[in-house]
Curated annotation (Swiss-Prot):
Official protein name in the record: DNA ligase
Keywords assigned: DNA damage, DNA repair, DNA replication, Ligase, Magnesium, Manganese, Metal-binding, NAD, Zinc
Originating species: Rhodopseudomonas palustris (strain TIE-1)
Residues that hold NAD(+) according to the record: 47-51, 96-97, 128, 151, 188, 306, 330
An example molecular function term from Gene Ontology annotations: metal ion binding
Binding-site list for Zn(2+): 435, 438, 453, 459
Homology family: Belongs to the NAD-dependent DNA ligase family. LigA subfamily.
Length: 715
């Protein structure tokens, strides 16, 4: 039978104890989505689904007001600022807006304003498009920009001043007359749709992460640690509000006059903003801008209505997390029905197999949609990331009629299946167990939803990332052959697998590397010398360089020490791979691998899967044919004062490098860890040791100076 999602309890029938449980569930879920949206710039659900969660939370809190507490999302704004940027306290909180989803809710908002102000007539209202971007506060002192901050949790944001100075729409100096001594001016950072598409194309071509929508790209670009990255992104800014103002630049200030002043001061103000004098005017603007929505060069997700007179705004004040004098009239999520013709599998650069729905073209929100992501096998089967049913547990099949929604108005997703129209012969989709690009086995590890290609060394879809890993510092570490060179050589077809690196010199009569821009005879000669120097390599570096899933530097060293030599390692791996079956592996070789301290089932299975793929073996054999010697692993001693001890190095070491210290400790039988815990035996502290030293003292861990460490290990 098909699993059914347990329906949310009806609010009308909720008892107080059940309401308390439901509120806790909703609060935790909303807080998680707030973090994904405000901190990670990666929302996990559509705006419509998020709004539905909030409306349910608000409805329950209205029924049980005694259950409202200060930590509820209805009493807070956004999410706490991330740790990567300095914190900034907003002089005036940056609150969020209440939402309206229907015309009568807008009318109710205006009536509430009239009642509160005791007005006979509808006050003038400013209507403006609600830009789907990232809120920003700009502080000016004597007309000069001194600080820029994100909204954060509404009270404390992140200092992004250096990045904001690269946005052309943000003036460093305010123009015109009547400039306040101090003012906080606010607006939205966004990205034009065409700029977003161009950026994603560049990201994809460079093998970098692509953004889900313009809002995410704007937020991610603004919150870059490298200001040059932000400067390279086409960010825009609309000004529409303010916080602290030492003085207003005009008598009897109003919202629309302040927007005019912002325009004169050097900001870009949205030209669509309109002054309305009735509810009918406001709703007419909403419908008009909704019709223009698809043709606008930027994304909007609704309309914001604000009482025009600032003295009225001041009298109206605020309720918990939002002002009484403004409301957001949200657009409904745009959906359409179409037929899913085919499910294709794409292979990512890390080997992940991702299903994509090929749809009969359909217009959703003014955009023609032909593809939609299906995420993974579980999503197709109707199972969410938490293991619970989604879409009422209904699976997705080729030939299905489906409802498509543009999440965040950009990413198409399938939200439901029209079961009444499912073809009689539609079969459940069977996820492929082979990579569609290279034909290698695909595996799905326990606890994961993703299938991955095991053709690590030979799959074209993974080639560039695997080659970058192969030449990385902890692997072959070839001087002069970094990521950019790998990308160039792979793009030209010169290096497709690791062995090709070692044949560059022999092929250079045809390749002519010295004719490349930035190269010359000397640099090419140095590159070939560096490559030749790596024809002799340590066993643990070779194992790490293969890019086997879950085999990092530490596990590579464990494997190298256990088997000792390349021949012993390869012999054991081939024996284990030959014995691999769908039911498992009971061979002596596999059991020996699985029993290595620190390895375990997950790593052992990943290693065997790698060696079970014959084309990986061929690529490895081709590489080994180019190498001169693979050095046996240096066996750790067991007769030293630190054998079996866990050691952490922290601070600036003066007598040896961190890598030298680590290698020496491991040779003496110690385990070197990256963090301090109760299991740590020694912390070796150099100059400017920080939090690790503090934690060691708190836990009572023995702390040694460099000299004391050298004395302990016998210098």
């Amino acid at each position: 039978m098909t699993a059914k999602t347990k329906p949310a309890p009806d609010i009308a029938t909720l008892t107080k104890p059940k309401a308390k449980v439901e509120l806790m569930r909703l609060r935790l879920e909303i807080e998680g989505h707030d973090k994904a949206y405000y901190q990670d710039d990666a929302p996990k659900i559509s705006d419509a689904d998020y709004d539905a969660l909030r409306r349910r939370l608000e409805a329950i809190e209205q029924k049980f007001p005694e259950l409202v507490n200060a930590s509820s999302p209805t009493q807070t704004v956004g999410a706490a600022p991330a740790r990567g940027f300095a914190k900034v306290q907003h002089a005036v909180p940056m609150l969020s807006l209440g939402n309206a989803f229907a015309d009568d809710e807008v009318a109710e908002f205006v009536e509430r304003v009239q009642r509160f102000l005791r007005l006979d007539d509808v006050p003038a209202i400013v209507a403006e498009p609600k830009i789907d971007g990232l809120s920003l506060s700009l502080r000016y002192e004597n007309g000069e920009l001194v600080r820029a901050a994100t909204r954060g949790d509404g009270f404390t944001g992140e200092d992004v001043t250096a990045n904001v100075r690269t946005i052309k729409d943000v003036p460093n100096t305010l123009k015109g007359k009547h400039i306040p001594a101090a003012c906080e001016l606010r607006g939205e950072v966004y990205m034009l749709k065409q700029d977003f598409l161009a950026l994603n194309k560049r990201q994809e071509e460079a093998g970098e992460t692509v953004f889900a929508n313009p809002r995410n790209s704007a937020a991610g670009s603004l919150r870059q640690k490298d200001v040059l990255v932000t400067a390279s992104r086409p960010l825009k800014f609309f000004a529409y509000a303010w916080g602290e103002m030492s003085t207003y630049p005009m008598d009897e200030p109003t919202q629309h006059k302040m927007l005019q002043w912002l325009d004169h001061a050097g900001f870009v103000v949205n030209p669509e903003i309109t002054l309305c004098h009735s509810v009918e005017d406001a709703l007419a603007f909403y419908r008009r801008i909704g019709e223009k929505r698809a043709s606008l060069p930027y994304d909007i997700d609704g309309v914001v209505y604000k009482v025009d007179r600032l003295d009225y705004q001041e009298r109206l004040g605020f309720v918990s997390r939002s002002p009484r004098w403004a409301i957001a009239h949200k657009f409904a999520a745009e959906q359409a029905t179409t037929v899913l013709e085919k499910i294709d599998i794409q292979v990512g650069r890390t080997g992940a197999l991702t299903p994509v729905a090929r749809l009969q073209p359909v217009t959703v929100g003014g955009v023609v949609v032909q593809n939609a992501t299906l995420h993974n096998e579980d999503y197709i089967r109707g199972i969410g990331n938490d293991g619970e049913p989604i879409r009422d547990g209904v699976d997705i099949r080729e030939g299905d009629t489906v409802v498509v929604q543009r999440a965040g108005d950009v990413i198409p997703q399938i939200v439901s299946v029209v079961m009444q129209k499912r073809p009689a012969g539609a079969e459940p989709y069977h996820f492929p167990h082979k990579c569609p690009v290279c034909g290698s086995h695909a595996v799905r590890e326990e606890g994961e939803a993703v299938w991955r290609c095991t053709g690590a060394l030979i799959c074209p879809a993974q080639a560039v990332e695997r080659l970058k890993h192969f030449v990385s510092r902890l692997a072959f570490d070839i001087d002069g052959l970094g990521e950019k060179q790998i990308e160039l050589f792979h793009e030209r077809g010169w290096v497709q697998e690791p062995a090709d690196i070692f044949t560059l010199k022999a092929r250079n009569d045809q390749l002519k590397l010295e004719q490349l821009e930035g190269y010359g005879e000397t640099s090419v000669r140095n590159l070939f010398a560096a490559i030749d120097a790596r024809r002799t390599i340590e066993l643990h570096r070779l194992i790490f360089a293969l890019g086997i899933r879950h085999v990092g530097e530490g596990n590579a060293k464990l494997l190298a020490r256990h088997y000792g030599t390349l021949d012993a390692f390869l012999s054991a791996m081939r024996a284990a791979a030959d014995a691999q079956t769908e039911e498992g592996n009971t061979s002596e070789a596999y059991q020996d691998l699985d029993n290595i301290a620190g390895i375990g089932d997950v790593v052992a299975e990943a290693v065997v899967e790698f060696f079970a793929e014959e084309r990986n073996i061929k690529a490895l054999d081709a590489l080994l044919a180019e190498l001169t010697e693979v050095l046996p692993a240096e066996q750790a001693r067991r007769d030293t004062a630190v054998a079996g001890k866990t050691v952490v190095f922290t601070g600036s070491l003066s007598k040896f490098t961190r890598d030298e210290a680590k290698a020496a400790a491991e040779r003496l039988g110690a385990k070197v860890a990256g963090s301090v815990s109760k299991k740590t035996d020694y912390v070796v502290a150099g100059e400017d040791a920080g939090s690790k030293l503090t934690k060691a003292k708190d836990l009572g861990v023995t702390v040694l100076t460099e000299d004391e460490w050298l004395a302990l290990i016998g210098n």
